[in-house]
Regions:
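Hydrophobic or amphipathic, alpha-helical segments that drive membrane association/targeting
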Residues: 1-112, 172-173, 267-276
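Short helix/loop segments within enzyme catalytic domains
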Residues: 80-101, 173-229, 259, 269-271
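Active-site recognition of the HExxH zinc-binding catalytic motif
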Residues: 89, 128, 143-156, 187
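Catalytic zinc-binding patch centered on the HExxH motif and its immediate surroundings
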Residues: 107-124
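Short pre-active-site segment immediately N-terminal to the catalytic Zn-binding motif
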Residues: 130-143, 180
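Catalytic Zn2+-binding segment of zinc metalloproteases
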Residues: 139, 149-165, 195-198
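Post-HEXXH active-site segment of zinc metalloproteases
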Residues: 154-183
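Pan-zinc metallopeptidase signature
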Residues: 224-276
């Protein structure tokens, strides 16, 4: 990970990650210890190894099936297919320290705006929904793409880490808190790449709004002010179960990190090339 990227990690991400690692490791040790306390520890250990191998084979097979679905039902970005978007992926990946860009796909989401980063076996992937590409312009898409690639760069999809931490995922509220910190980290890393930080604010706000015709009329400051309307206790109770912070907080945090003057864009895209 490039040093200039790591400084944008949320302070709580490392703490929650360390807690997951420690608790997960301790629980794995307890599981192994319980095996050796059985009446026939050798048989129990063999059974554990067999179940582990079966699970590993099943996960590999499911990953292969999912990739087959992506290749057969989605559109792969390349130099020949949507070269402008593909160039953004390559440029963002290079700036974040990846020699090879993740394989990128666009799929028909039937109106759902989303993007996600995946790690299947050793392959890195980023998926964009059609609704997202339709609603956001190229600068906003650069932010979304940077956010998803940051998940790969910051090690959020590391299989070994997930395995060690897996038992701790069942500790109430711990994994969601860690996940929310990761989202803040990726927002900051991606915003760092943009010359116009306002594009990061509006890109996030578009995920809440979703209306293409309103893209160039959004006010991030007004959006952040919605936090004043949030019932404190209800807002807290809702968020502690979520993997992502609420959007108003994500926009507010970016404004606190970067010298952003939140303004509404003064023009709409002048051509089809400007629009995503």
């Amino acid at each position: 990970m490039p040093p200039h990227i790591s400084i944008y990690q949320h302070p709580q991400e490392k703490g929650y990650g360390a807690a997951l690692t420690v608790i997960g490791s301790a629980l794995w040790l307890l599981i192994i210890l319980s095996v050796f306390l059985q009446k026939n520890p050798v048989a129990a250990l063999i059974a554990l190894v067999i179940y582990g191998l079966l699970l590993w084979v099943m996960m590999k097979f499911m990953a292969a099936l999912f990739r087959a679905w992506m290749v057969g039902s989605m559109v792969v970005l390349s130099e020949q297919q949507f070269p402008e978007l593909h160039a953004i992926f390559v440029d963002v990946s290079r700036k974040l320290g990846l020699e090879t860009a993740p394989e990128a796909f666009i799929y028909n989401s039937h109106g759902v705006m989303n993007a996600l980063a995946l790690r299947l076996s050793r392959g890195r992937y980023v998926l964009l929904t059609s609704a997202l590409v339709e609603a956001e312009d190229n600068a906003q898409l650069r932010f979304v793409i940077g956010h998803e690639i940051a998940h790969h760069v910051l090690g959020h999809l590391n299989s070994a880490k997930h395995f060690i931490r897996y038992p701790a995922f069942f500790v109430p509220f711990l994994y969601p808190a860690y996940s929310r910190a990761r989202e803040y980290s990726c927002d900051a890393v991606s915003a760092f790449l943009l010359e116009d930080k306002n594009q990061a604010l509006t890109a996030l706000q578009m995920l809440a709004c979703g209306a293409k015709r309103l893209n160039y009329e959004m006010s991030p400051s007004a959006f952040i002010d919605q936090e004043k309307l949030m019932p404190a206790f209800a807002g807290f109770c809702r968020e502690i179960f979520l993997s992502h912070p609420r959007m108003t907080r994500r926009v507010a945090r970016l404004m606190s990190l970067f010298p952003i003057v939140a303004v509404k864009p003064d023009r709409a895209p002048s051509s089809a090339q400007d629009a995503a």
